[in-house]
């Protein structure tokens, strides 16, 4: 007999037990959050904190309920999106109505730290190209747009409590630029113990490790609570272009802006064709007649390989999103934005010991199903250029791109080709290690694949072509000499160039 992969329905006695356990756990959490609120000493901070704890409790309660009911997607009901739910960028009208820029605001998600690349402070201040960091490039792009079209497109940064203070200092340097930069903070939620499901922090001003920013799905609530959404509407802004702060391909695109206004869509998600490097990326589906974002975490184990298939799920979410501001206001005020919860388990240092914690997060892309006329636009790969690792950093610093008004533009000789696949080993994980080992970026215009592992340094004026693999064993050292040209080679062993 064939199995369908569906779970057995829960018996009534199981439901009753789960329901009681859920109520007890929720009640304990509510009491703990009330106690936390009592520790706020500054009356100006009380309202915001209580509001955040209420929002956290709503999320926590929903997490418990969904966990108890075992609600999951029915894989058999998943369909590919229809032709009006995903449209090709090339089919959009090419007329450029610059007047529409008066309806636009740009938002960069700026809550992340640079710790994964070995840096202290906000990730957005890592230098990526010609002395510019992520924020510098975003400012230059929008400033150029404002000058060219005599516009006044504002830039908003959604910070977290981890990045806010540093970002405020950094943006002072843009005061003389032709751009308005505004910042606001996303929520600060308490981490919870994995075993007891109670909050880690014991007071409002407990250490930073006790708290977490709850993912970019918090954007809608934070926009409204900060007053920034009403301020944008008062300026006549209608559309918010949202992107990850580390995606260097996410520039303002008038074609998509015009298309959104023409169609009246409340939400547009930029998609791009999957490659084997993107098999874990979220994808758009049609589920019971509505457009939804399907993330790998929601996929039953037996269907993960199918989800990764490039044939069935051709596109993935770039997290470049165009969202109608009035629609956000209406949905938030009606408490109507309910998105999938992503439980994130971590081990953190707290006090003198390591503890296992849970943080409940949400993603902004998952809200697509609540907006009218929502659809995906399949954009060129050039609009997705994230910098997550030093391997990505090598790519964006290279001669593959040139800088034009803050935007990275691909060298025309690479048109039609995918970017080279670059894999740098653990010696290059931190920016400091990357910079000391590759002080001069090699020419990679003709490169297809690069792998470097071990104690390797690269000299000045090096060219890499085709497939280049450099493997240095433990205890050995490889110095690639100045001016070397490596083409379709594997370099192993021990190679040190002595200065004479």
From Swiss-Prot:
What general EC class does the enzyme of this chain belong to? transferase
Q: Where does UTP bind?
A: 109-112, 123, 186, 215, 246, 388
Per the annotation, which location comes first and is thus the protein's main one? secreted
Q: Which SUPFAM superfamilies match?
A: Nucleotide-diphospho-sugar transferases
User: Which PROSITE patterns would you find in this protein's record?
Assistant: INTEIN_N_TER
The residues listed in the UniProt record as binding Mg(2+), with positions renumbered to this chain, are: 123, 246
Q: Which reaction does it catalyse?
A: alpha-D-glucose 1-phosphate + UTP + H(+) = UDP-alpha-D-glucose + diphosphate
Cystine connections = none
Q: Where does substrate bind?
A: 111-112, 216, 244-246
The alphabetized UniProt keywords are: Cell wall, Magnesium, Metal-binding, Nucleotidyltransferase, Secreted, Transferase
| Subunit details | Homooctamer.
Q: What is this protein called?
A: UTP--glucose-1-phosphate uridylyltransferase
Question: What organism does this protein naturally occur in?
Answer: Candida albicans (strain SC5314 / ATCC MYA-2876) (Yeast)
